Each structure stands twice: as structure tokens, then as C-alpha cells.
């Protein structure tokens, strides 16, 4: 059905033109006349009578005008009524005459959609699309078709959809679907649907609950989406739909979407009769008319899911229509009342029954706000009306009003009250050891209640500040929302016990008079037999005394908080109600300050930070290698800290600032191309240990060789002069004496010979001194002429660009697992021009498989009001509650009166109960305990292939293939199966901790896991908090107990630094899902499948000749700090791949354009001080030689584009000096050896 979308005006934005009265002709009907006799005679008689009785016309009387005005007014009133009825008529008209789009959809829907019914009501729709029957999963009920109702549906919670195969005989009724969704207008049951920006929207009011499952059609009648719900956004409503994208099902869910299945009425119970909770048809359904019966009905349905609907209906039963405002939130308090409860310290060091008793102090909010529950009620007056400026408290058994301005809270100093409603106060307080709440009553008397409570505002972030900054950083935190609307949090209430009041009794002679003062009074007297009852009028008891009677006021028209500080109503037992409470705890963001940036000074492999904290600020740092060596320190004053920067890098976090990262460079003060002392200084600053070891070894070797030479010379000398010394009167020849430094004529000392030469022959004296100098000159000249006896030794092990040459269609290479470092590989095939592939890791994610064991959080201890059994013994009953404890205590209260208000002669007992539940904060403040299993690794890789930069994502498992243009890449698996996560991890608010937590069901008191639950919302709770009930003190109603502190709170204080700060290899830890990002560990193999069409034949590529390379400048260990100029001659214009055949050199350019005779400049990076490398352009190689100098910057904030795995190489200059020294020492040894050999040969020949 093709049609052109027409402009329609249903659901238009503009209101219809206002109705105006049109000018009409007033028709006045004549009065009814009497019937006249027929015939001409009768007509003649009437005509004569008219002529005879004719009078002069007169002006109309005023009465006629008044009647006319009245008539006009009546017409105006009828017109006004028509105006009021006009919109209703128009709406009914609109429903009767649907627009073109609606008529179009109705025709298609007649065949392809079916109603889903539940208990006779339509809750949604099912649609026949393609070969499937589709129904929203949230729609409850059965399809209104016998064949479709029998089908077995498959449920998908991800898409909120249920699907089944269409019966064969119904396939012709199904609609087609399409994934083509150009922006524009589409059709559905209620008119037009606009599709723009990937969202479907309709005018607000066009859709409603019950429309879930309706299809959206295009102009050809094809289904483009199925409606699930909607989100009201003002004038427009965004639809939540299931749609298709290239045959893939997707779900579009705008924020705030509500499911549009028809809500089913929730049923409540009264006297074995069910009724809708929102519409109670019973007699006691209005609290204002029958309060006691209404509360009884609510207590009977307290566990029903529609309890709060019933409560709202019972409170809003008045026929008067009320506006919805903040007063409605206080409406529930009309069924409750304040109360008196026991306070341990009423301000004067003694306990009392206080009207402002403290029930509970909550401090879960991480922004430091306290939520305090007290026994009085704020914002409600005694007449149950709402007034922000008032509060009501219990004075004896009567509520009394007071001004809210007299309310105060303090710890070590006055607190700031930020919100109040009902029993609850929000306050921001300074740290302290106690908390006091008080107010001034209507008689100007101050009432206070003090509790021991250690309050220390929690730390948000990494700086201990005192006030919110104007500018800073937003961090996640939790706070109590300042809203009085109904929330998910609730408290239990019950009927209050009878309140004793002995002032109602007066002694009159021998009788007791009970004055009720309009109240219901329960009395019991022990005189002349048992005399007890319930009265509402004054009563006189004869022959009795006041001491023999007990009176108590009974009020069952209002509930009271189920407090452990007040007794339970013995008649009601466990009956109770519940009401919502304000100020829920929610997650939000808090602005925190950012510390001043430190003054950074770079040194050789060190960074010095000058810190200026405005308040105590945390400084932490870690190495980004295998051993993180994490340190942290609180800085309170100006301080200078020097930190060593390892080769793998350093991460420093200062306050709430983002982490600073530093990497060292191979900088030094010496040079590898200077004199020996400069060379030694160069290598000493780079590798001090290695340099010292090499110098020590060389010194030992040289000293040994020199010593050996001297030893051989001494041996030769001894061999030469010994025969002459043994012959009497022998004279040593002159030449031998000169060579062996021996006396020729007589055995004189060197001093005597020198004296003799100085006195007799001074020329010979000077010649004797010149002999060693000439020998040194000869040795130096020999060293100069000594040819190079050894080649340059390099000790560099650099892995930067793995250039592997292959001759196959398939190519494999290995790239380092370092993000941001480009890696190249050269692919060579016979007959084809070489191809260069450049790959760069942009991110590597390691995601473990997790299984949730449980969540743990703070617990709260529930202590219901104690049950006091007067004149008898109570019994405990078993209850399936977490950490439930129940004990019965005897001999607690006196037989007469006492704190339990008993009036009997037998023993009284108290039944105390307590159990543990998850705190209200568990929905936002909890830690999740996971088991971590095998991790999957995924990589985001940038590939330069065929002149295009393409980014792909793939699993690094060695199996998952991704396509880049026409090539297939298989990445992984990693060379190192390493993970920063242990087998057990804990996740708390975006932070991950390795922790060996206790298993489910084995928690220990006061430690992590003392309370456990499967999810934050689940009802199954395990607890072990060492809860022990204790004997109550006589004279006061209370439930004392002993309990271990919260293990969750203790863990929060002692948990230490998270993996975000302590993980090795520079891992960045993230959550949702839990993963480790960019861990620089190991290597990643890459297998590439390249088709033949991607290669260029040699005949088609340019031929390069006459190539020469000249390095203009070179700074080693820097980011492409070298520049080389290559001159060439190309046979034709084209594009050639550029690659360094030497692994130790990285070239930035993957390919260049060549033409004719020209030159090109390339940038390269190397860690060599003397770089000898070959550059391949197309198929031609050229040799380049570079003399590189160290970088000037000691520290940089980016990783090096190459990775060194050993010591630096030895420069050509250094090798030249090594050759000279080695040659010189070797020459001396050789000469000495030659002399010794000659001497030995001559000596042996003589003998």
C-alpha cells in the first residue's frame, strides 16, 4: 500500500479556534390559539371584530425589554454551556473520524496484530512480522487467538521480546519488516511517528499504557519497529521500541522510559473478600470517618503489594478535590502520632522519658550529611495539617505544637539543619563524640536528648578539605535527597500501648472517681473483687481507694513508630503497618578541590616535585613495570620530594588531579664522540654499574699485560747480565749496558753513574735521559700506524620495528604490547614491489569472566518494641530472619507499676527480639565479591594498509579474524598469560581490589562479608554479626544488645589503595565491566593474509637508482630525532614503500612519492649513538651512517617509540680509542716477548 504522507491535524499543537456566537434571527413562537369554527362566516366575524377593536400602536413597555434581556442572558448561558461542551464533542468527533494515517494502520493491523488479554482485559498486543510472532515480554496475558495461544515462545530479556514461529496457515497475514529507516514520518495506530536522530517520537498524549506491542509502519506498510513504551519529554514523547539494523535486532530505550502494558489492578483483602486496592468498596475505607476500623484494614493488608495504594485511598477518600503539592506528602502522618521514649541522657546527666528521644542516627552519606530519627514530628500540627514552621511533640498523652525554630542539633559545635519532615532531620555537623538533639516547647522549656555517637565526616577524593570549592572536580558520592515525596524506604508503625495517667482519678470520700476528659480510658481496680473495663464517660467506683486502681488512656485511632524504647501493645501482638519516609540515599556527584599543580624539576632519571598543599593532600606514585613499588604519603605543608623514574615509566597522582606520567630519556652530560674522559662520563651516567665493571676489567687486563711485559723485560735483562756478573773482572759491553741499564765497568749504582756522567760527561747524561722519551715517541708512532685489529663491538639489543622479510602470501610478525608505539613490517615477494605495513596498538583490554558470589554492605539492627507479659511468662517463637535472636527475661519489672505499666501481683516477663537486615544504604553503598576466571583480551589496532589508516577491533585469541580492506588480520594470543586480577576480587564504586574474601555463608563478625546477599535488591540475606540480647535494666523500657561493628565499614577504612593505583605494568583498571586496559606486558603476534591483488609487480613500480644518504642531524633515544636526506633517480613517477632493514632504526614515513631526479627527507628514531642502517625504497637499498648525540631533556611525558632491552652500543669514537689503547698495550707486550725470545735464543745457543 503505497501512499504519499499527507498533512494531518490530529493531535495538533495548537488549540482549536475559540467558539464565538454567530448572529442569528430570533424566532418568537406565537401563543397557542383557540380553535375557530370553520367556514367563511367564522372568518368574517373575526375580521369585523378586529377592525372594531383596533387601537393606536404604542411604544413597547419596559417589561418587554426586560423579558428580552432575560432571554438574551439565557441564550448567553446556553452558549457558554455549549462552549464548555464543545471540546468534549470534538474529542468524540475525533475518535469517530480517524485520520488518513490511522485508517491506513487500522487496515493493516486488522490482519497482523492480535490482542493480549489477562483476566478479560487487553494488556497489550502481539504482532505477526515476517515468519515470527512477536510480543513484548513485559506484557502479561494470553494472545486472543486459539492457534497463537498454543505456541511456545522464546524469551529475550535483553530486548524485552518474546518470539515464536508463525503457523503455516497464518503466514499470509504477516507483515513484512525492513531495516531501512530514513528520517521522516511513519505511521502507527494513533497517527504519525517522527523518526529523527535515531529516535521515534510522537506528540505527548498520543500513546498510553496498553499500546505496548503495536507496530510502526512505513509508507509501504512494512514494519520498522515495535513499540514497548515511552518517555514523556514535554510536548513530545520518545518511544521505546525494538527495531532492526541490517537484520540485527536492536532496542532503543530513551532515558526515563515507562512500559506501556496495561497495569493490572492489585487486589487487597477484607473479611475474606478481595477488592482493588485503589478502590476499596468497603465501609471502613475512609480514615476520616472510621479511623480505627481503617487502620485495622491496613494492618490486615500490610504484606500485600498494593498496600500503599490502599493507604492512599483511605487517606484521600474525601469528596473534595485536592491539588497535588508538597502537603500530600505529609498526608500520611495524619495516621501517626509523636511519642515519649526513653533517653539515656536528657541533658542533666540522667535518663528520662523524652519527647525528642533519639531512635537512629544514619551516616551512610559520603558527603557527611546525617539523617536523624527522633520521636517528635516536624512539619505537622496537632490538627494533622501541614506547616513547615511547626512541630508537634507528645506531652504526657496529648500532642502539643511548638515552633520549628527552636529545634537544634549539635556535636562538638552546632550543626546546620538542611531538611526536616516527620520524624527525620537532615543535618551537616562537625566531627564530635556525641550528638545532641533538642527543641524549645510552647512553654519555653528546653528538651534535649544526647547519645554517644562518633562522627567524622568521610573523605571524598584525596584531599581533606572543609568547604566546597567554587571550581574543582566532580567525583561520585552519595547524599540524602531533599525531597519529601514517597520513597522506597519505609518504617514500621503499630498501635501504641495504653498510656497510664493517674491524674484521671480522684478520691471522693470512700469512692474513686475517674474523669475521662473526652478520652477512652481503661481502668482496673482491686477492691471488692475485680473491677475493670473501658469507659468513655466519667465513672465512680464505690468503696475503693486510688492506690487500688490503675487507669490508662487508650488511643487506637493513630499509629506510633515501632520503637524498641516503648512497649508493644499486648492486645495487638505482631500487627503492624508501614509508611514511607523521606530523604532517600542516592548516588550523585560532589565537587572537590584540585590541588595546586606541583613545580616540577627534571633531573637525570629523577623528577623533583615542589608541593604547595592548601590542606592535607595525598601524594601517591607507582612504577609502570612488573613491580609497581607503590608509595603514598599525606602532605600537610610545603615539601620537596625527589622520585626516581624507572625505565618503564612513573605515574604520580597528586590530590584530585589527573595522574602525571613520566618516562626517562637516555640523556647525559658527556658525549660518545669525544675524548676518553667524555666517553667514560657518557656511559657512566647512562649505565654506571656496567661502566664501572668494564673499566675495572679493562684496568685489570691492561695492568696485567703491562706487568707481564715488565716481567719479560726483567727476565731478559737478567739473562743478559748474569754471565758478566759471574765472571771476575768482566766488563759489560756498552750497548748491552745501555739496553739493560747495567754498569759497564764497575758495579756502581744509578746515582753514582749519574753523578759520574754529570761531573765528567754531561752530554752523555742528557742522552741517557732522552732514551725513555724517544722510546715513548716510538711506541706512540707505532700505535698510530697499527692497523685496525678488531671490528666495532656493539652491545645494543633494541626491539623497535620488527622488519621481517617473507616470500609468502601469508605473513606473520610480532609487535610489542605497548600502546602508542608504531610498528612496521616489510613484506617482500619475488617479482613484486615490497609492501610496508604499519600497525599501532590504540588500546588493549583484558576482561576476566566474573561470577558474582554476593554483595555486602552495612547492616541495620531491627529491634521491635519489646513485648511485656504482665502477670505471666512470654514465649519465643522461631522466625526465619537473618541473625535472629529472641530471649525472655524474668524478674525485670516490679510486680506493681514499674516501667511496663503492669498492675498485678505475679511476676512480669519481657520478650526481646532482634534481627539484622540490609541497611537502606545497600542500594547505593555496597561492595560486590566476584570470582575471576579466564580473561579474554581484545585489541584496538590502527593499521596503515594501501595508503589508508584503518582502525579495527578484534579479540587477541589467535582465532578471531578481522578484515582490513581486502586483507585478513588474526591477532594474538599474547605471549604472556598474565592478569592483574586474582581469583577473588572485590568491586566497590568503580574501584577493584584483590582480596581473599570469605565464601557465601561463612562470614565472620566484624569483617568483610558479615552480611551477605545475592544482589542489592534480593531478599535472601545471610548475617553473622555476633548479635546477643542483654538483660534490660529495671524501670525503663528498652532492648539492650551487644553486636560486632559493621565489617563493611571497617573494610572501607582499611581497604587501602585499589588496583587503579597499584596494578603493575601501568594497567588502567575500569569497571562496568571489570577490565584492565593498556597493560604493557609481553608481545602480540599478528598473522596477516594478504591477497595477490594488493601487491604491485616490479615492472609496474618505479626503479630507483643513484641513491645516496646523508644524515643531517641525529638525537638518539628521542621521538624521531633523526633527519636523513636521500638523493635518488627514479625511472618514472610513482609511490614507493620506505623501510629500514635494520631493526634498531625506526622510520616514520611508510611510503613516499618519487619522480625523476630528486631528494626526499625522512625522519627516523634510534637508540644507537652511532647508527649504521640501510633504508629500502621500493627494491633499492642505500646505506646511511649517523653520529647521534644524547637528548637534552632528561624526562618526557610520552613513551619512547622504541624499546631498549640491554645496554647502549659503543660508538665508533669510543671503539677508536679502545683500538688505540689495545694496540699500544699489545705492541708493548709483543716487543717485550720478542726481546725475551731473542735473549733466550742467544742464551741457549751459547750453552
Swiss-Prot record:
It catalyses: Autocatalytic release of the core protein from the N-terminus of the togavirus structural polyprotein by hydrolysis of a -Trp-|-Ser- bond. Disulfide bonds join 112-127, 268-277, 282-286, 285-317, 343-449, 346-352, 415-429, 477-590, 525-549, 527-544, 720-741, 857-922, 870-902, 871-904, 876-886, 1067-1079, 1109-1184, 1114-1188, 1136-1178. The lineage of its organism: Viruses, Riboviria, Orthornavirae, Kitrinoviricota, Alsuviricetes. The record marks 260-261, 324-325, 747-748, 808-809 as: Cleavage. A lipid is attached at residues 720, 740-741, 1241 (S-palmitoyl cysteine). The record marks 186, 219 as: Involved in dimerization of the capsid protein. InterPro entries: Alpha_E1_glycop, Alpha_E2_glycop, Alpha_E3_glycop, Alphavir_E2_A, Alphavir_E2_B, Alphavir_E2_C, Flavivir/Alphavir_Ig-like_sf, Glycoprot_cen/dimer_sf. Residues 154-159 are annotated as: Interaction with spike glycoprotein E2. A motif (Nuclear export signal) lies at residues 143-153. Residues 720-740 are annotated as: Transient transmembrane before p62-6K protein processing. This is Structural polyprotein. Residues 182-192, 218-222 are annotated as: Dimerization of the capsid protein. GO terms for biological process: fusion of virus membrane with host endosome membrane; proteolysis; symbiont entry into host cell; symbiont-mediated suppression of host toll-like receptor signaling pathway; virion attachment to host cell. It is an enzyme of class 3 (hydrolase). Residues 112-260 form the Peptidase S3 domain. A lipid is attached at residue 1241 (S-stearoyl cysteine). Structural polyprotein: Specific enzymatic cleavages in vivo yield mature proteins. Capsid protein is auto-cleaved during polyprotein translation, unmasking a signal peptide at the N-terminus of the precursor of E3/E2. The remaining polyprotein is then targeted to the host endoplasmic reticulum, where host signal peptidase cleaves it into pE2, 6K and E1 proteins. pE2 is further processed to mature E3 and E2 by host furin in trans-Golgi vesicle. GO terms for cellular component: host cell cytoplasm; host cell nucleus; host cell plasma membrane; membrane; T=4 icosahedral viral capsid; virion membrane. Glycans are attached at residues 272, 587, 669, 949, 1078. The active site is at residues 138, 160, 212. A motif (Nuclear localization signal) lies at residues 60-98. Residues 892-909 are annotated as: E1 fusion peptide loop. PROSITE patterns: ALPHAVIRUS_CP. Residues 36-67 are annotated as: Host transcription inhibition. Residues 261-273 are annotated as: Functions as an uncleaved signal peptide for the precursor of protein E3/E2. Keywords: Capsid protein, Cleavage on pair of basic residues, Disulfide bond, Fusion of virus membrane with host endosomal membrane, Fusion of virus membrane with host membrane, Glycoprotein, Host cell membrane, Host cytoplasm, Host endoplasmic reticulum, Host Golgi apparatus, Host membrane, Host nucleus, Host-virus interaction, Hydrolase, Ion channel, Ion transport, Lipoprotein, Membrane, Palmitate, Protease, RNA-binding, Serine protease, T=4 icosahedral capsid protein, Transmembrane, Transmembrane helix, Transport, Viral attachment to host cell, Viral attachment to host entry receptor, Viral ion channel, Viral penetration into host cytoplasm, Virion, Virus entry into host cell. Belongs to the Old World alphaviruses that usually cause fever, maculopapular rash, arthralgia and myalgia.
Amino acid at each position: 500500500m503505497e501512499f504519499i504522507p499527507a498533512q494531518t491535524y490530529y493531535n495538533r499543537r495548537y488549540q482549536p479556534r475559540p467558539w464565538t456566537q454567530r448572529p442569528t434571527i430570533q424566532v418568537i413562537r406565537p401563543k397557542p390559539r383557540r380553535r375557530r369554527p370553520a367556514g367563511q362566516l367564522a372568518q368574517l366575524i373575526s375580521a369585523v371584530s378586529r377592525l372594531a377593536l383596533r387601537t393606536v400602536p404604542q411604544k413597547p413597555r419596559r417589561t418587554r425589554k426586560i423579558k428580552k434581556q432575560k432571554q438574551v442572558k439565557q441564550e448567553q448561558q446556553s452558549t457558554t454551556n455549549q462552549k464548555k461542551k464543545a471540546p468534549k464533542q470534538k474529542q468524540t468527533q475525533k475518535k469517530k473520524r480517524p485520520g488518513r494515517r490511522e485508517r491506513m494502520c487500522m487496515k493493516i493491523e486488522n490482519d497482523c496484530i492480535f490482542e493480549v488479554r489477562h483476566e478479560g482485559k487487553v494488556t497489550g498486543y502481539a504482532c505477526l512480522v515476517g515468519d515470527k510472532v512477536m510480543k513484548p515480554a513485559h506484557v502479561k496475558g494470553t494472545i486472543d487467538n486459539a492457534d497463537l495461544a498454543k505456541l511456545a515462545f522464546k524469551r529475550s530479556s535483553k530486548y524485552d521480546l518474546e518470539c515464536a514461529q508463525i503457523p503455516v496457515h497464518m503466514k499470509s497475514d504477516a507483515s513484512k519488516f525492513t531495516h531501512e529507516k530514513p528520517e521522516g514520518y511513519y505511521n502507527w495506530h494513533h497517527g504519525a511517528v517522527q523518526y529523527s536522530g535515531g529516535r521515534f517520537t510522537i506528540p505527548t498524549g498520543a500513546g498510553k499504557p496498553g499500546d505496548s506491542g503495536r507496530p510502526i509502519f512505513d509508507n509501504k506498510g512494512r514494519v520498522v519497529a515495535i513499540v514497548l513504551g515511552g518517555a514523556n519529554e514535554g510536548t513530545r514523547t520518545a518511544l521505546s521500541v525494538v527495531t532492526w539494523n541490517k537484520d540485527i535486532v536492536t532496542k532503543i530505550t530513551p532515558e526515563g522510559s515507562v512500559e506501556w502494558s496495561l497495569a493490572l489492578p492489585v487486589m487487597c483483602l477484607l473479611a475474606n473478600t478481595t477488592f482493588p486496592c485503589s478502590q476499596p468498596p468497603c465501609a471502613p475505607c475512609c480514615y476520616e470517618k472510621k479511623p480505627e476500623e481503617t487502620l485495622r484494614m491496613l494492618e490486615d493488608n500490610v504484606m500485600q503489594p498494593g498496600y500503599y495504594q490502599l493507604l492512599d485511598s483511605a487517606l484521600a477518600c474525601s469528596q473534595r478535590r485536592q491539588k497535588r503539592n508538597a502537603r500530600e506528602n505529609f498526608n500520611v502522618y495524619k495516621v501517626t502520632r509523636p511519642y515519649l521514649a526513653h533517653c539515656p541522657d536528657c541533658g542533666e546527666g540522667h535518663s528520662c522519658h523524652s519527647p525528642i528521644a533519639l531512635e537512629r542516627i544514619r551516616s551512610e552519606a559520603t558527603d557527611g550529611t546525617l539523617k536523624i530519627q527522633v520521636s517528635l514530628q516536624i512539619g505537622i500540627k496537632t490538627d494533622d495539617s501541614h506547616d513547615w514552621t511547626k512541630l508537634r511533640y507528645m506531652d504526657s498523652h496529648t500532642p502539643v505544637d511548638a515552633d520549628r525554630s527552636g529545634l537544634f542539633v549539635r556535636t562538638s559545635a552546632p550543626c546546620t539543619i538542611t531538611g526536616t519532615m516527620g520524624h527525620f532531620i537532615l543535618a551537616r555537623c562537625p566531627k564530635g563524640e556525641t550528638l545532641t538533639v533538642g527543641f524549645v516547647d510552647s512553654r519555653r522549656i528546653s528538651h534535649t536528648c544526647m547519645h554517644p555517637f562518633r562522627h567524622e565526616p568521610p573523605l571524598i577524593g584525596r584531599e581533606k578539605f572543609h568547604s566546597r570549592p567554587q571550581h574543582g572536580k566532580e567525583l561520585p558520592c552519595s547524599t540524602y535527597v531533599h525531597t519529601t515525596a514517597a520513597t522506597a524506604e519505609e518504617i514500621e508503625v503499630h498501635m501504641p500501648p495504653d498510656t497510664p495517667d493517674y491524674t484521671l482519678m480522684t478520691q471522693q470520700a470512700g469512692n474513686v472517681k475517674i474523669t475521662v476528659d473526652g478520652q477512652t480510658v481503661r481502668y482496673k481496680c482491686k477492691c471488692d473483687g475485680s473491677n475493670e473495663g473501658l469507659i468513655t464517660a466519667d465513672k465512680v467506683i464505690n468503696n475503693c481507694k486510688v492506690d487500688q486502681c490503675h487507669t490508662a488512656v487508650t488511643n487506637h485511632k493513630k499509629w506510633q513508630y515501632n520503637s524498641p524504647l516503648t512497649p508493644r501493645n499486648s492486645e495487638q501482638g505482631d500487627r503492624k503497618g508501614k509508611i514511607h519516609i523521606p530523604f532517600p540515599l542516592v548516588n550523585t556527584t560532589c565537587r572537590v578541590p584540585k590541588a595546586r599543580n606541583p613545580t616540577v624539576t627534571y633531573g637525570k632519571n629523577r623528577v623533583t616535585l615542589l608541593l604547595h598543599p592548601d590542606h592535607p593532600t595525598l601524594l601517591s606514585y607507582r612504577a609502570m613495570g612488573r613491580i609497581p613499588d607503590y608509595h603514598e604519603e599525606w602532605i600537610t605543608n610545603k615539601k620537596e620530594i625527589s622520585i626516581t623514574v624507572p625505565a618503564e615509566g612513573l605515574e604520580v597522582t597528586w590530590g584530585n588531579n589527573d595522574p602525571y606520567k613520566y618516562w626517562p630519556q637516555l640523556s647525559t652530560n658527556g658525549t660518545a664522540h669525544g675524548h676518553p674522559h667524555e666517553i667514560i662520563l657518557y656511559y657512566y651516567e647512562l649505565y654506571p654499574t656496567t661502566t664501572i665493571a668494564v673499566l675495572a676489567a679493562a684496568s685489570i687486563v691492561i695492568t696485567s699485560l703491562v706487568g707481564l711485559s715488565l716481567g719479560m723485560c726483567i727476565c731478559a735483562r737478567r739473562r743478559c747480565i748474569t754471565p758478566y756478573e759471574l765472571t771476575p773482572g768482566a766488563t759489560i759491553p756498552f750497548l748491552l749496558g745501555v739496553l739493560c741499564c747495567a754498569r759497564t765497568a764497575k758495579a756502581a749504582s744509578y746515582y753514582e753513574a749519574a753523578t759520574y756522567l754529570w761531573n765528567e760527561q754531561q752530554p752523555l747524561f742528557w742522552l741517557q735521559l732522552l732514551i725513555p722519551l724517544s722510546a715513548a715517541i716510538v711506541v706512540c708512532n707505532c700505535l698510530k700506524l697499527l692497523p685496525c685489529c678488531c671490528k666495532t663491538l656493539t652491545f645494543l639489543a633494541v626491539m623497535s620495528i620488527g622488519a621481517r622479510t617473507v616470500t609468502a602470501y601469508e605473513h606473520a610478525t610480532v609487535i610489542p604490547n605497548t600502546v602508542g608505539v608504531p610498528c612496521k613490517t616489510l613484506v617482500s615477494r619475488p617479482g613484486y614491489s615490497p609492501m610496508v605495513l604499519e600497525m599501532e596498538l590504540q588500546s588493549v583490554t583484558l576482561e576476566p569472566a566474573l561470577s558474582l558470589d554476593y554483595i555486602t554492605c552495612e547492616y541495620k539492627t531491627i529491634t521491635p518494641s519489646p513485648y511485656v507479659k504482665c502477670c505471666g511468662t512470654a514465649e519465643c517463637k522461631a522466625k526465619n530472619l537473618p541473625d535472629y535472636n529472641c530471649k525472655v527475661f524474668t524478674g525485670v519489672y516490679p510486680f506493681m507499676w514499674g516501667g511496663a505499666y503492669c498492675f498485678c501481683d505475679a511476676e512480669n516477663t519481657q520478650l526481646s527480639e532482634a534481627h539484622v537486615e540490609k541497611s537502606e544504604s545497600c542500594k547505593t553503598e555496597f561492595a560486590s565479591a566476584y570470582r575471576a576466571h579466564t580473561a579474554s583480551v581484545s585489541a584496538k589496532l590502527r593499521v596503515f594498509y594501501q595508503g589508508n589508516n584503518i582502525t579495527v577491533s578484534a579479540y587477541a585469541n589467535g582465532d578471531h579474524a578481522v578484515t582490513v580492506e581486502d586483507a585478513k588480520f588474526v591477532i594474538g594470543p599474547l605471549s604472556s598469560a598474565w592478569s592483574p586480577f586474582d581469583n577473588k576480587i572485590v568491586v566497590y564504586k568503580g574501584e577493584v581490589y584483590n582480596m581473599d574474601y570469605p565464601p557465601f555463608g561463612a562470614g565472620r563478625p566484624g569483617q568483610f562479608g558479615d552480611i551477605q546477599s545475592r544482589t542489592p535488591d534480593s531478599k535472601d540475606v545471610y548475617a553473622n554479626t555476633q548479635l546477643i540480647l542483654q538483660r534490660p535494666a529495671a524501670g525503663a523500657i528498652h532492648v539492650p544488645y551487644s553486636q560486632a561493628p559493621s565489617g563493611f565499614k571497617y573494610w572501607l577504612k582499611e581497604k587501602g589503595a585499589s588496583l587503579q593505583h597499584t596494578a603493575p605494568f601501568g594497567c588502567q583498571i575500569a569497571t562496568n565491566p571489570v577490565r584492565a586496559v593498556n597493560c604493557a606486558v609481553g608481545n602480540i603476534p599478528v598473522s596477516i593474509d594478504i591477497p595477490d591483488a594488493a601487491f604491485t609487480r616490479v615492472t609496474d613500480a618505479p626503479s630507483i637508482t643513484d641513491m645516496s644518504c646523508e644524515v643531517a642531524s641525529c638525537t638518539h633515544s628521542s621521538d624521531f630525532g633523526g633527519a636523513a636526506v636521500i638523493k635518488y633517480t627514479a625511472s618514472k613517477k610513482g609511490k614507493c614503500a620506505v623501510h629500514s632493514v635494520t631493526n634498531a632504526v625506526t622510520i616514520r614515513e611508510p611510503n613516499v612519492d618519487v619522480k625523476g631526479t630528486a631528494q626526499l627527507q625522512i625522519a627516523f628514531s634510534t637508540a644507537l649513538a652511532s647508527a649504521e642502517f640501510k633504508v629500502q625504497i621500493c627494491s633499492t637499498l642505500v646505506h646511511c651512517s649517523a653520529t647521534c648525540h644524547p637528548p637534552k631533556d632528561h624526562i618526557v611525558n610520552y613513551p619512547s617509540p622504541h624499546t631498549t632491552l640491554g645496554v647502549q652500543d659503543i660508538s665508533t669514537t669510543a671503539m677508536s680509542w679502545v683500538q688505540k689503547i689495545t694496540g699500544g698495550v699489545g705492541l708493548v707486550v709483543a716487543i717485550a716477548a720478542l726481546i725475551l725470545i731473542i735473549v733466550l735464543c742467544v742464551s741457549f745457543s751459547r750453552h
